[in-house]
């Protein structure tokens, strides 16, 4: 087969691409709920979103600056604490080394002066005597004798002067070191105060800038709100003027009752234009009320007559009931008298029968011996 390259029409391709773009835009409009809902001000919503993002960015920058300043403060404090700890440790180390190297007891100049065994360690005064076995008369050193007392006193006084001068020098050096330490502490405190002042000034400037930006944003929002309220007032004033014009030129304020009649249905009434009833309507209503009043009066009269009849019938019924009750009481009295006489007769007869039984039939009463003859065995 031959490979034949077909040429495409550029206009047709452009038209197809344009149709595709229009279809995409239409689908975007249809499927985007926020743009499809009627009554949404997209520009205002976008402005609000932009304001909120700027406000959040300003807050984040403020928090970041505050966090950075806090980190700097912490780093400075840690550095100062570390330097102070290193300085204290080095000073203690140097003091300990000096004591170990320079202030040993055996190396002290006064050790030989205050040594309690120095007298016994010294050599005797006379060493020329070469007798190997001297007697008691040749003793050269006795207990409690101090031959070098003057020399030792002079050396002790010299040592006292040396110690006093050295103590004075050490005190002066300690004062110099203390003054130097105080000067360094003051310089460090001044540097920290300057750093804190600088950071406070930076924070104040950031706060002032943020407040200025917030004030500008509030002013802009207030201006927008004022413009919106002004437009609303103007629109309301126009509506009020139009309403006043309509009320003054329409049939609402007229006294013609015909304006309340519906143009399409004469039997209907327009409530907002109704001015009251006509004299004919009022006369018809009064006539109807009079008819209703007469009917009501006749009905009341009939009810009154019926009530009178019911009362008379009730009274006659009550009289008949009273008579029947009287007759019933009389009959009950006669019945009670007859019943009483009958009961008396029965009582007399029963008494006579009981007397007959007791006097004639039950004359032989059983004794205890008679009852003991029964149930004498188990069979």
Swiss-Prot record:
Residues 8-21 have a biased composition (Basic and acidic residues). Pfam families: RIB43A. Residues 82-111, 216-304 form a coiled coil. GO terms for biological process: flagellated sperm motility. Residues 1-21 are annotated as: Disordered. Keywords: Cell projection, Cilium, Coiled coil, Cytoplasm, Cytoskeleton, Flagellum. One of its GO terms (cellular component) is sperm flagellum. It is found in: Cytoplasm, Cytoskeleton, Flagellum axoneme. Microtubule inner protein component of sperm flagellar doublet microtubules. PANTHER family: RIB43A-LIKE WITH COILED-COILS PROTEIN 1, RIB43A-RELATED. Belongs to the RIB43A family. This is RIB43A-like with coiled-coils protein 1. It comes from Homo sapiens. The gene is RIBC1.
